[in-house]
Curated annotation (Swiss-Prot):
Belongs to the DNA gyrase inhibitor YacG family. Residues 45-64 are annotated as: Disordered. This is DNA gyrase inhibitor YacG. SUPFAM superfamilies: Glucocorticoid receptor-like (DNA-binding domain). The gene is yacG. It comes from Klebsiella pneumoniae subsp. pneumoniae (strain ATCC 700721 / MGH 78578).
Length: 64
């Protein structure tokens, strides 16, 4: 007997069973999934970084 893992939808907070019966997991629906994607695309959400933008100077494709 296996226990079902239950998570909350990150968008609306509804409970979602983490399993094949929930194709949009961790979201409860396609709508909540698209709302989250839109927030990332609009840069309302971001992964915090301690890096300085000057660190990317070494990544330049231009040759000195």
């Amino acid at each position: 007997m296996s226990e079902e893992t239950i998570v909350n939808c990150p968008t609306c907070g509804k409970t979602v069973v983490w399993g094949e019966q929930s194709p949009f997991r961790p979201f409860c629906s396609k709508r909540c999934q698209l709302i989250d994607l839109g927030e990332w695309a609009a840069e309302e959400k971001r992964i915090p970084s301690a890096g300085d933008l000057s660190d990317s100077d070494d990544w330049s494709e231009q040759q000195p």
